[in-house]
C-alpha cells in the first residue's frame, strides 16, 4: 500500500508542478506541448468472476481512488500517465474481512473534442499492476488463533484499460470529469478475474 500511495502522490505533485510551469502553452505558438491537464478521481464499480483453484467466484462493489496527468500534443490528441488502486470487500462465501484489491498504472493516449464547455474523450491506458486476493473461508477474524482455510495470493498483470469520458469546464482552469472503463488485467494464465466496469468522478486542472 505504501508503494501505491507514493505513486499516487507523485502523480498529484507532477500535476501541480507542471500546471505551474506551462500556463501559456495552449496557444498556436509552434511548441510541441499544447496544454496540460491533470487531477484526481474516485471510482466505484461492480466486479465478478473468479480464476482461483477453489471454485470461488467473488463478486461485489469496488471502490478506489487515483490520479491522472496528461499533455496535449495537438488540438485533439493527448498522452500522459495515470494510476489507481481499487478494493472490493467480500462477504458472500467467505468470512467478512476478505477482499480483492487491484493496483495499476500506465501510459495513456486519448482523443478528445471540444463542444462548448464539454470535452468528451476516448482512449486506452497500457501498463501493469498487481492483484492481491485475501480469502478467509473459515475462522474468526476477532481472535488471535491461526486459521487453516485462509488464502493470500498476489498476481502481477499487464493492464490494458480502454475508457471513455467527458470533462466539464466549470471555471477557468478547472473541470469536473466523469469516466467509465473496463480494465483488462492479463496475467500468465490469461485474463484476470474478477473484472467489470468502473465509473470515475473527479476534478481536473487544465491549462
Locations of regions flagged by a protein language model:
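Short glycine/proline- and aromatic-enriched beta-strand/turn motifs that initiate or cap beta-hairpins
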Residues: 19-73, 78-79, 204-207
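Predominantly the C-terminal beta-signal and adjacent terminal strand-loop region
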Residues: 22, 88, 160-207
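Extended hydrophobic secondary-structure segments that form protein cores and membrane-embedded regions
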Residues: 38-40, 122-125, 178-181, 200
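Gram-negative (and chloroplast) outer-membrane scaffold detector with strong preference
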Residues: 44, 70-144, 160, 168-174, ...
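Extracellular loop and loop/strand-boundary signature of outer-membrane beta-barrel proteins
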Residues: 50-55, 91-97, 146-152, 185-191
Amino acid at each position: 500500500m505504501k508503494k501505491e500511495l507514493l505513486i499516487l502522490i507523485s502523480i498529484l505533485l507532477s500535476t501541480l508542478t507542471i500546471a505551474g510551469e506551462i500556463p501559456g502553452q495552449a496557444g498556436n505558438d509552434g511548441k510541441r506541448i499544447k496544454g496540460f491537464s491533470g487531477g484526481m478521481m474516485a471510482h466505484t464499480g461492480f466486479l465478478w468472476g473468479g480464476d482461483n483453484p477453489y471454485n470461488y467466484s467473488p463478486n461485489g462493489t469496488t471502490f478506489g481512488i487515483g490520479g491522472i496527468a496528461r499533455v496535449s500534443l495537438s488540438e485533439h490528441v493527448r498522452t500522459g500517465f495515470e494510476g489507481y488502486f481499487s478494493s472490493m470487500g467480500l462477504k458472500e462465501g467467505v468470512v467478512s474481512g476478505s477482499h480483492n484489491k487491484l493496483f495499476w498504472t500506465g501510459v495513456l493516449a486519448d482523443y478528445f473534442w471540444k463542444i462548448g464547455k464539454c470535452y468528451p474523450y476516448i482512449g486506452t491506458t497500457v501498463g501493469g499492476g498487481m492483484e492481491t486476493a485475501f480469502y478467509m473461508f473459515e475462522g474468526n477474524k476477532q481472535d488471535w488463533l491461526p486459521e487453516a482455510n485462509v488464502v493470500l495470493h498476489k498476481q502481477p498483470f499487464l493492464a490494458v484499460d480502454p475508457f471513455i469520458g467527458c470533462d466539464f469546464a466549470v471555471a477557468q482552469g478547472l473541470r469536473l470529469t466523469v469516466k467509465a472503463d473496463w480494465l483488462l488485467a492479463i496475467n500468465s494464465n490469461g485474463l484476470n478475474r474478477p473484472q467489470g466496469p468502473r465509473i470515475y468522478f473527479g476534478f481536473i486542472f487544465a491549462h
